[in-house]
């Protein structure tokens, strides 16, 4: 299956970021002041004054391959991540990723290889349960899982950390899988009703 992402929820907006920045003077928003929000956000982003962008959050549910999983785990500041654990449960769905830019014969080869590993995973897990107990069986049988195996992760960014994630992962030099994930996340944020982060995204050149 393909990697997938869902936007579960969000908090904040361009106004949230602007009011946070203006707390040092006055949070009251006049009509004239409201009109200056795009300019303010652009200045904050370009000058590196990014603390106000920490006041909003974006909450995603993703299903990704192990390589993309590792890319996500490298983002620790302003990011909260929980994920499926093969140590605590048997991964019965056998989700796995096949690169869609490969020749068909290689896609089929990886599909077959991964399916063999998944079958052995379940077989060995059940056998080890008899000799080593369920806990040890789950945490060690997973060594049969391939790098293409997918897990589901609950990921929440504040907007500052999301912008940093996009800078690194929505880049031509990033691995295809994580670049596509970042692009889909960005698309979902842009499609939010009312476009609440329109000027913040423009401030960061998205």
Residues of each region from the PLM?
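Family-specific signature for flavin-dependent thymidylate synthase
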Residues: 1-206
């Amino acid at each position: 299956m393909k990697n997938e992402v869902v936007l579960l929820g969000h908090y904040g907006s361009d106004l949230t970021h602007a009011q946070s920045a203006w707390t040092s003077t006055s949070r009251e928003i006049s009509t004239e002041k409201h009109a200056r929000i795009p300019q303010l956000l652009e200045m904050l982003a370009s000058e590196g004054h990014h603390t106000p962008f920490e006041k909003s959050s974006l909450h995603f549910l993703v299903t990704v391959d192990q390589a993309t999983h590792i890319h996500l785990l490298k983002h620790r500041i302003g990011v909260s991540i929980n994920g499926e654990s093969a140590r605590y449960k048997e991964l019965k769905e056998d989700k796995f990723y096949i690169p869609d830019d490969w020749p068909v014969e290689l896609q089929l080869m990886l599909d077959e290889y991964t399916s063999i590993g998944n079958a052995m995973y379940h077989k060995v897990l059940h056998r080890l349960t008899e000799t080593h107990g369920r806990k040890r069986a789950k945490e060690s049988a997973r060594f049969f899982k391939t790098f293409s195996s997918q897990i589901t992760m609950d990921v929440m960014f504040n907007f500052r950390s999301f912008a940093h994630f996009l800078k690194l992962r929505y880049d031509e030099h990033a691995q295809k899988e994580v670049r596509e994930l970042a692009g889909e996340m960005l698309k979902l944020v842009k499609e939010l009703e009312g476009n609440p982060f329109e000027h913040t995204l423009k401030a960061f050149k998205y």
